[in-house]
Swiss-Prot record:
SUPFAM superfamilies recorded: PLP-dependent transferases
EC numbers for this chain: 2.1.2.1
Recorded GO MF terms: glycine hydroxymethyltransferase activity; pyridoxal phosphate binding
Protein name stated in the entry: Serine hydroxymethyltransferase
PANTHER family documented for this protein: SERINE HYDROXYMETHYLTRANSFERASE, SERINE HYDROXYMETHYLTRANSFERASE 1
Organism in which the protein naturally occurs: Corynebacterium efficiens (strain DSM 44549 / YS-314 / AJ 12310 / JCM 11189 / NBRC 100395)
Gene: glyA
Subcellular location: Cytoplasm
Catalytic reaction(s) noted: (6R)-5,10-methylene-5,6,7,8-tetrahydrofolate + glycine + H2O = (6S)-5,6,7,8-tetrahydrofolate + L-serine
A biological process from GO: tetrahydrofolate interconversion
Lineage: Bacteria, Bacillati, Actinomycetota, Actinomycetes, Mycobacteriales
Class in the EC hierarchy, top level: transferase
Role according to the record: Catalyzes the reversible interconversion of serine and glycine with tetrahydrofolate (THF) serving as the one-carbon carrier. This reaction serves as the major source of one-carbon groups required for the biosynthesis of purines, thymidylate, methionine, and other important biomolecules. Also exhibits THF-independent aldolase activity toward beta-hydroxyamino acids, producing glycine and aldehydes, via a retro-aldol mechanism.
Residue list for modification N6-(pyridoxal phosphate)lysine: 237
Length: 434
């Protein structure tokens, strides 16, 4: 076929020509990511190699089943890729078994519950209102509809998970599954204590490490793998990979977990996403990755310290638990004139993206909230060091402390300067099809 024919063939036209509306929106999103500071704790920036793997011809391939046992022909190359992803996941986390097919963290969690419990069985996880996740028993989620739920919470004085209270709740409720994990909790969990409690009441222990998996991979957070029967995770938060899920487990659960993922929860796996997972997991084993995770935690601690400064305290701002061990900080605005929505909007005006978040015992509605969840993974990926994190922490602290009286133009100029000092995706236009 000649070049002239290619020019009129929709198979060969670039996105900018075939669908300028979508291309323009993608370009706009690229500009947003470059020009603002991303501080949503569950977001990150994937490397060029991960973008390339996910945007590859693997998107064309159906591969129901598992390597060596597919229901389609032509799976020789995708078998290699899935085996690489599984082996890398097991090696990275020192796990006996890995399933890398879940399309998302929620899909992984659904498969875990299908494996460990029957509909109507009782599960026990951290309350959503106290920092848990939708899939740990929220009543509108499948986990709250299919299973009986007995949640545990945090201590009202310390805002920490009290293991004595967890034990009392477990003895009282006798759950089939105990869940350790969170989406908004700034401290380490005691996995050994959870294991002891699970053994005492005859429950299986499932740890959801979606948020802190990257810290575990870097050796900067206690690993749940030696203690849990099953561990699930996303790949796109601190791990910095594609939006997807993985499951790790003791070998005893392998067959049932595989069956719960396929055909239990999903049909064909997304092989382009699995390739991107494999690449992200390889990167997660490098010294560069570990150094980035160290900066992630350092940045969060710098932010927590700034939000406990005198001007923040005078404005009624507090930091949940007084600090952080991980990649996020929870700003407590219950005593502030601003609610979570107003604080989120204020930071958005100066070019910092965060998300409002309920705090334990929150008096405000869920769509308003009395808190902010602020994370550092994306900025650490961007290259931020202690000096840069100190600057962005001061921008946030000043904005929240001064509220409506803050000089937003000046704060926005400081954000722009940081974004320019730490450029993102340089040359991206040259190596994508946009």
């Amino acid at each position: 076929m000649t070049d002239a024919h290619h020019a009129d063939d929709v198979r060969y036209q670039p996105l900018s020509e075939i669908d300028p509306e979508v291309a323009q929106a993608i370009a706009g999103e690229l500009s947003r990511q470059r020009d603002t500071l991303e501080m949503i704790a569950s977001e990150n920036f994937v490397p060029r190699s991960v973008l390339q793997a996910q945007g590859s011809v693997l998107t064309n391939k159906y591969a129901e089943g598992y390597p060596g046992r597919r229901y389609y022909g032509g799976c020789e190359q995708v078998d290699i890729i899935e085996d690489l992803a599984r082996d890398r996941a097991k090696a990275l986390f020192d796990a006996e078994f890995a399933n890398v097919q879940p399309h998302s963290g929620a899909q992984a969690n659904a498969a875990v519950l299908m494996t460990l419990a029957d509909p109507g069985d009782k599960i026990m996880g951290l309350s959503l209102a106290h920092g848990g996740h939708l899939t740990h028993g929220m009543k509108l989620n499948f986990s709250g509809k299919l299973y009986e739920v007995a949640a545990y919470g945090v201590d009202p004085d310390t805002m920490l998970v009290d293991m004595d209270q967890v034990r009392e709740q477990a003895i009282k409720e006798q759950p089939k599954v105990i869940i350790a994990g969170w989406s908004a909790y700034p401290r380490h969990l005691d996995f050994a204590a959870f294991r002891e409690i699970a053994d005492e009441v005859g429950a299986t222990l499932w740890v959801d490490m979606a948020h802190f998996a990257g810290l575990v991979a870097a050796g900067l957070h206690p690993s749940p793998v030696p203690y849990a029967d099953v561990v699930s995770s996303t790949v796109h938060k601190t791990l910095g990979g594609p939006r997807s899920g993985i499951i790790l487990a003791k070998q005893d659960y392998a067959k049932k977990l595989n069956s719960s993922v396929f055909p239990g929860q999903q049909g064909g796996p997304l092989m382009h996403a699995i390739a991107a997972k494999a690449t992200a997991l390889k990167i997660a084993g490098t010294d560069q990755f570990a150094e980035r995770q160290a900066r992630t935690i350092e940045g969060a601690r710098i932010l927590a310290e700034r939000l406990t400064a005198s001007d923040a305290k005078a404005a009624g701002i507090d930091v949940l638990t007084g600090g952080t061990d991980v990649h996020l900080v929870l700003a407590d605005l219950r005593n502030s004139e601003m609610d979570g929505q107003q604080a989120e909007d204020l930071l958005h005006e100066v070019g910092i993206t965060v998300n409002r978040n309920a705090v334990p015992f929150d008096p405000r509605p869920p769509m308003v909230t009395s808190g902010l969840r602020i994370g550092t993974p994306a900025l650490a990926t961007r290259g931020f060091d202690a000096t840069a994190f100190t600057e962005v922490a001061d921008i946030i602290g000043t904005a929240l402390a001064q509220g409506k009286s803050a000089d937003l133009e000046s704060l926005q100029a400081r954000v722009t300067k940081l974004a320019e000092q730490y450029p993102l995706y340089e040359g991206l236009e040259d190596w994508t099809i946009v």
